[in-house]
């Protein structure tokens, strides 16, 4: 409550060009930068453990960072340090950094000491691909290459997408106040679509009329979706955890009137203690360990 609606998360199924069905989930993510990172890895690891016999090739976590956030938020360093640990690894994460060279109003030179925002990737000796955000084909090639590397080696991969932010950080930010020279240059710079269309036209792959038709088709689709959404009088939110919680019930006032019985039968406690503190007969323990085990057992049995 109080956060932006597009942070709610979403799950859907898609069919790839190869005819494969893939389930995609955008994890609910609060406006606290990078706080969702360990949640995403936890979801991935849980699925690997529960559904895929820990086969890292079956689930792939993807994180989309900002350049200022990945370099400045400590939680990023924490999850990357866990990337290859036995109890936490997920078979590699694809890190895509939208590097717009500014963090809200902070110039990148004032935001970090490292040369690149992706230098954190050196911790795990991960490959880092620096890609021109205006080169659509280079980005597509890099995504495929990063995925192939991840699937083969089970390691994290970083993509530093060097680009720019067309407008302010949000509706209340006027970037020309804080970065006037940068935004003067950005205002004169053609957008990636225009650059790619001109490239395809120069190569004889695309005609101008076809490009206009494709743009109109896309705009018409967006407009149709807007009109469709306006017909919905009340939005419903389906809990993505519903199936996991269906066997549980909500607590009632009656549940809190009296304290529950949490005691354990003495016989059961003694049985557990015996199982825990009985040393295997086929192993030889040092005297200090034997003494410690006996002392702990006595705490329960005496």
Feature names for model-found ranges:
Residues 1-125, 129:
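Cofactor-binding active-site loop characterized by glycine-rich and histidine/acidic residues
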Residues 4, 8, 155, 181-203:
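Metal-dependent DNA phosphodiester-chemistry modules and their immediately adjacent helices/loops
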Residues 89-95, 107-125, 161-194:
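Flexible glycine/proline-rich, aromatic-decorated loop/lid segments
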Residues 116-142, 189-211:
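Conserved thiamine diphosphate
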Residues 192, 203, 207-302:
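Hard-cation-handling environments
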């Amino acid at each position: 409550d109080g956060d932006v609606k597009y942070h709610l998360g979403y799950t859907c199924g898609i069919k790839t060009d190869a005819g494969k069905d893939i389930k995609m989930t955008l994890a609910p993510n609060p406006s606290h930068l990078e706080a969702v990172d360990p949640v995403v890895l936890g979801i991935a690891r849980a699925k690997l453990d529960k559904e895929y016999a820990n086969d890292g090739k079956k689930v792939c976590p993807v994180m989309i960072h900002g350049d200022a956030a990945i370099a400045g938020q400590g939680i990023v360093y924490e999850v990357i340090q866990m990337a290859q640990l036995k109890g936490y690894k997920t078979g590699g994460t694809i890190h895509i950094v939208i590097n717009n060279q500014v963090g809200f109003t902070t110039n990148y030179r004032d935001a970090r000491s490292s040369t690149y925002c992706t230098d954190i990737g050196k911790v795990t000796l991960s490959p880092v691909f620096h890609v021109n955000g205006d080169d659509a084909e280079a980005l597509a090639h890099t995504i495929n290459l990063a995925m192939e590397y991840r699937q083969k080696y089970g390691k994290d991969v970083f993509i530093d997408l060097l680009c720019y932010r067309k407008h302010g950080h949000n509706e209340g930010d006027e970037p020309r106040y804080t970065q006037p020279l940068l935004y003067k240059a950005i205002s004169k710079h053609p957008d990636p679509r225009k650059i790619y269309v001109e490239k395809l036209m120069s190569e004889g792959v695309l005609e101008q009329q076809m490009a206009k038709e494709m743009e109109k088709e896309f705009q018409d689709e967006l407009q149709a979706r807007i009109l469709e959404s306006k017909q919905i009088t009340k939005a419903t939110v389906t809990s993505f955890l519903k199936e996991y919680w269906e066997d549980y019930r909500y607590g009632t006032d009656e549940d809190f009137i009296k304290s529950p019985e949490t005691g354990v039968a003495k016989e059961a406690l003694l049985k557990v203690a015996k199982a825990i503190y009985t040393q295997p007969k086929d192993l030889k323990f040092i005297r200090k360990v034997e003494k410690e085990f006996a002392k702990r057992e006595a705490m329960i049995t005496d």
